[in-house]
Amino acid sequence: MSLHVCPFWVGYLLLSPVRKLLTNPDRILEPYIRSGMTVLDAGTAMGFFSLPIARLVGESGHVVCVDLQERMVASLKKRAVKAGLDGRMEFRVCTTDSLAIDDLAGSVDFALAIAVVHEVPDPRAFLAAIFAALKKGGGLLFSEPAGHVSGDGFNGSLSLARAVGFEIRTTRKILRSHSALLSK
């Protein structure tokens, strides 16, 4: 798979209030995230999901936000400081070869990979890194945009997820996306 990186300016579009109305992050995340959890947002961009996660995990929780683009992470950090949530958030820049989360092995309660797996050069390695970071029984909300990824393409990614050890718990309805809840 070739590397496609979301242009930085698209990060601002992803934060659109219209997107929030159509794809409400709180409604999507509330069934899975509780106070005190450690949550990984892999492919965080400017934090459309990260800031709501930080509110949901509360003061005793922790959100690890990882993205390939330093500018995206810097923008998210500014937004987190402005929202007063930066104390419960960690910001990391990864590389095309590593998600940079090896130190999290077995410590993450829940993870998100929203509209990102189709952009990484090695989806299997990406999913394996998330699997390793999760605690036993931990979950991954995996979603890809239907406009970029076909149903067959998403099923291929689910096969990769199974190959690294994930179990598919259920599919999810998220507007214009192929989505599933996976578990370790």
What are these regions (language model features)?
Residues 164, 173-184:
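Core SAM-dependent methyltransferase catalytic element
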Residues 40, 46, 51-99:
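Class I SAM-dependent methyltransferase SAM/SAH-binding core
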